[in-house]
């Protein structure tokens, strides 16, 4: 309707065919090729609620139903509604929808019984178009039946109708979304006799390529048939294969489809392969039909070489996915050590069987003997690993020092206890030994006894230090040091090590030196005679696995590089200190061969495990530097009652306790000494001094060469020599001049400078200076003698200098006895 007096306005449309009328479209134009124009964004913004659009993602065509409100300006498109309306009336407010096939507009209320825009479907086809499609479908089915009966005329009519159907039918978007690739039946396309008759460009190119492949095959490989030329045969075969390919993978679209193209590339590649002549011959001789060829997979069409390679790759992948079952016993590492998991008996049976087969095959030759020795050692190690476990429990084997995983050097230093425990375990392990010893012989006990020789010899020597050996990049190693001796006769391994290095600090490794440079240097220093050498052996101090592994890693680090470690912990008396690794078969260095009275001689050892030796180059040792305090009675007592064998850990604890006891005894001795006072005396004629402990007045200053102020390892004050007295005669410890009241040592005598000495060794004071006793109680001489006989006191570190009296214990004891008699 038009409003009087107003200029008619243009109708707005959101259809894809905006600006064109359907009656002007040519009948020969294929709607499938018409692409949708982009909507005007301005128009969409002005009327956003008049259209419900849903953009398809897969369909090639963009035709879809449109629903809009009638407007006054709508003048394009055909209106055909069941209500009889032929024009759009915007004033009634009804929504109109367009058929996607005939492009005619109808009221939504009339055909769908709803005026709600949300309920309008995305794709709409009117009733007339639906009936038309139903009739065409029935006609197609009838044509298929007629084709099966072999009626040529009906087949021709059917093909004509199919061509007409293809040129007019456009699938709606709903169908395109559900089935993006439409399959084509054999009856919907006319078969051609020549390649030139094919109208689709893609199909024509595919058929021509297949023909070229078959033409290149020599005619001697196949038989074209009677009255048929090779070229005609190849063309017919190519057309047949292409038709099967199109029927299986083609679509109704002119673009044919991606599946068709991909399959054709696979066929062309495998048929052109120069190594795949077998496939070409099979196709041309009819062994492989065109339908079978199209259905074959890519791997089935490969040449034999590629098929074999693919089979090998598949088999390799299968092998990688299968877990390999290990027949050897597994080891579980726990906080208690390593435990064998699995059936031990079954494993022993397998080893026995392998051993018998090995003997039968190799005989008694040298190679056979070596092979048997290897197997015997493996079984012996496993047997030893289970010996201790079976003695404790028959169900869960425990760790043993002879485990095949743990190297032979990883064993406790507590050899005395370990040997007895091992013998006890060996008795309980007789069942396993009876089974294995029949073949192997009883060799495990001899091997174990040989292994304990070296460690027993070293561990029984007196140790001089325990601590850690840290090095950058490696774990700290807990070790104990056993003295190997020195090149000086004045070196006492019990006390002299305190002047070589600091026992309270670790033996830090600060560098390394090449062995080829270190050995000549050490030989030169020792040959010059200006310095002495002292050495001790380092062994792991704990039985834990971590300490043993750290010890072995430290050894392996230097031995594998043929280098010596440079030790940082050394006193000012030491010029150089090195850590030397010694393999079981290495001869001791020349430097170590010059040691005097070593506690352990390396040349006599049958070493079966690596060792670490610390070597110190010290200044020339004098009697005062290297001598040690010793009491003959204690030595005799030690020889008469030798100490029991102890483990390293027990010996460390015992010596720590002895050192504390010595300190406490010295403190008690100081407390028990009575205080005395110094009384000046007048000069008098020389007289024999009766009491040996009488206090005296101020003493003259003693020159440095005459003696020293020192103590007997914890005594209150030192012993001073009487000025002018002959060497070897002790004097009375005195207090400094002007300091009365300082307690004197409970031993010795003092007098003025004497000009003569009695034969008995008693100093004679001048006549003008008689002695007067002060009345102080005499000291406890028995306690002093007991203190001097204490072995811990004797083994304590020496003072910087020593009195001659301390080097003559017999004289010291005789003086004490004389004092007691008086």
Swiss-Prot record:
Q: Where is the composition biased (Basic residues)?
A: 11-21, 49-71
Q: Which UniProt keywords apply?
A: Metal-binding, Nucleus, Repressor, Transcription, Transcription regulation, Zinc, Zinc-finger
Q: Name one GO molecular function term.
A: zinc ion binding
- Any S-S bridges, and between which cysteines? none
The Swiss-Prot or TrEMBL record describes its family as follows: Belongs to the BYE1 family.
Q: Which residues form the TFIIS central domain?
A: 198-323
Q: What does this protein do?
A: Negative regulator of transcription elongation.
Q: Which residue stretches does the UniProt record annotate as biased composition, category Polar residues?
A: 392-404
Main location (coarse class): nucleus
Intracellular or extracellular location(s): Nucleus
Q: What is this protein called?
A: Transcription factor BYE1
* Region annotation (Disordered) ranges: 1-93, 132-189, 359-409, 417-436, 632-682, 755-778
Please list the GO biological process terms of this entry: DNA-templated transcription; regulation of transcription by RNA polymerase II
Q: Which PROSITE patterns match?
A: TFIIS_CENTRAL, ZF_PHD_1
The record's section on Pfam families has: PHD_5 (PF20826), SPOC (PF07744), TFIIS_M (PF07500)
User: Which gene codes for it?
Assistant: BYE1
Biased-composition ranges, Basic and acidic residues, are 22-48, 148-166, 359-383, 637-653
Q: Which Gene3D superfamilies match?
A: Transcription elongation factor S-II, central domain (1.10.472.30), Zinc/RING finger domain, C3HC4 (zinc finger) (3.30.40.10)
Where are zinc fingers of the kind PHD-type found along the chain?
A: 78-132
């Amino acid at each position: 309707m038009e409003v009087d007096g107003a200029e008619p306005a243009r109708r707005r449309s959101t259809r894809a065919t905006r600006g064109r009328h359907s009656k002007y479209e040519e009948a020969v134009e294929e709607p499938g090729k018409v692409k949708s124009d982009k909507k005007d964004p301005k128009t969409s913004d002005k009327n956003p609620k008049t259209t419900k659009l849903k953009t398809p993602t897969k369909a090639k065509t963009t035709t879809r139903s449109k629903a809009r409100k009638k407007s006054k300006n709508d003048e394009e498109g055909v209106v055909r509604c069941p209500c009889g309306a032929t024009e759009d009336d915007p004033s009634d407010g009804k929504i109109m929808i367009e058929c996607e096939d005939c492009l005619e507009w109808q009221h939504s209320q009339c055909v769908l019984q709803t005026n709600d825009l949300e309920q309008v479907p995305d794709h709409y086809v009117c009733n007339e178009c639906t009936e038309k499609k139903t009739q065409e479908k029935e006609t197609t089915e009838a044509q298929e039946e007629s084709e099966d009966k072999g009626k040529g005329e009906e087949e021709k009519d059917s093909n004509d109708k199919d061509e007409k159907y293809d040129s007019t039918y456009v699938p709606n978007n709903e169908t395109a979304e559900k089935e993006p690739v439409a399959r084509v039946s054999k009856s919907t396309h006319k078969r051609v006799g020549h390649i030139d008759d094919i109208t689709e460009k893609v199909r024509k190119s595919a058929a021509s390529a297949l023909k070229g492949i078959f033409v290149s095959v020599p005619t001697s490989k196949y038989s074209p048939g009677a009255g048929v030329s090779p070229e005609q045969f190849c063309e017919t075969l190519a057309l047949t294969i292409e038709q099967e390919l199109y029927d299986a993978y083609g679509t109704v679209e002119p673009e044919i489809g991606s599946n068709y193209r991909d399959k054709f590339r696979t066929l062309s590649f495998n048929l052109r392969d120069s190594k795949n002549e077998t496939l070409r011959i099979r196709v041309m001789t009819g062994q492989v039909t065109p339908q079978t060829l199209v259905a074959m997979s890519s791997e089935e069409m490969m040449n034999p070489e590629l098929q074999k390679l693919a089979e090998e790759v598949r088999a390799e992948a299968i092998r990688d996915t299968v877990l390999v079952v290990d027949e050897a016993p597994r080891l579980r590492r726990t906080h208690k050590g390593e435990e064998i998991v699995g059936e031990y008996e079954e494993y022993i049976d397998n080893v026995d069987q392998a051993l018998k087969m090995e003997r039968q095959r190799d005989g008694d030759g040298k190679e056979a003997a070596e092979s048997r020795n290897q197997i015997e050692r493996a079984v012996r190690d496993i047997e030893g690993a289970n010996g201790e476990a079976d003695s404790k429990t028959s169900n869960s084997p425990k760790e043993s020092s002879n485990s095949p995983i743990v190297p032979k050097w990883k064993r406790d230093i507590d050899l005395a206890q370990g040997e007895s425990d091992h013998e006890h375990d060996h008795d309980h392990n007789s069942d396993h030994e009876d089974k294995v010893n029949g073949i192997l012989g009883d060799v495990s006990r001899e091997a174990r006894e040989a292994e304990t020789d070296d460690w027993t010899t070293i561990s029984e020597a007196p140790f001089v230090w325990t601590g850690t050996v840290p090095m950058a990049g490696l774990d700290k190693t807990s070790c104990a040091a056993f003295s190997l001796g020195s090149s000086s006769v004045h070196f006492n391994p019990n006390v002299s090590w305190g002047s070589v290095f600091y026992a309270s600090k670790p033996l830090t490794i600060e560098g390394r030196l090449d062995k080829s440079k270190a050995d000549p240097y050490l030989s030169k220093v020792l040959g010059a005679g200006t310095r002495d050498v002292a050495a001790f052996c380092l062994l792991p101090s704990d039985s834990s696995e971590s300490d043993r592994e750290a010890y072995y890693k430290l050894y392996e680090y230097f031995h594998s590089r043929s280098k010596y470690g440079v030790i940082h912990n050394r006193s000012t008396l030491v010029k150089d200190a090195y850590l030397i690794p010694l393999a079981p078969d290495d001869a001791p260095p020349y430097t170590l061969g010059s040691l005097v009275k070593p506690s352990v001689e390396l040349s006599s050892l049958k070493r079966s495990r690596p060792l670490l030796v610390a070597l110190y180059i010290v200044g020339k040792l004098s009697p005062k530097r290297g001598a040690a305090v010793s009491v003959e009675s204690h030595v005799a007592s030690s020889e008469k009652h030798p100490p029991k064998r102890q483990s390293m850990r027990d010996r460390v604890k015992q010596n720590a306790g002895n050192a504390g006891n010595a300190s406490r005894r010295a403190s008690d001795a100081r407390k028990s000494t009575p205080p005395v006072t110094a009384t000046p005396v007048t000069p008098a004629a020389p007289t024999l001094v009766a009491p040996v402990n009488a206090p005296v007045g101020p003493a003259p200053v003693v020159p440095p060469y005459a003696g020293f102020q020192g103590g007997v390892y914890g005594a209150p004050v030192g012993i001073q020599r009487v000025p002018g007295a002959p060497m070897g005669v002790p004097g009375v410890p005195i207090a400094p001049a002007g300091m009365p009241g300082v307690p004197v040592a409970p031993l010795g005598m003092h007098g003025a400078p004497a000009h003569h000495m009695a034969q008995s060794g008693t100093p004679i004071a001048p006549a003008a200076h008689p002695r007067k006793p002060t009345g102080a109680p005499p000291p406890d001489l028995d306690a002093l003698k007991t203190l001097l006989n204490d072995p811990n006191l004797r083994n304590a570190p020496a003072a910087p200098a020593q009195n001659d009296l301390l080097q003559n214990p017999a004289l010291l004891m005789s003086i004490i006895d004389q004092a007691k008699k008086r």
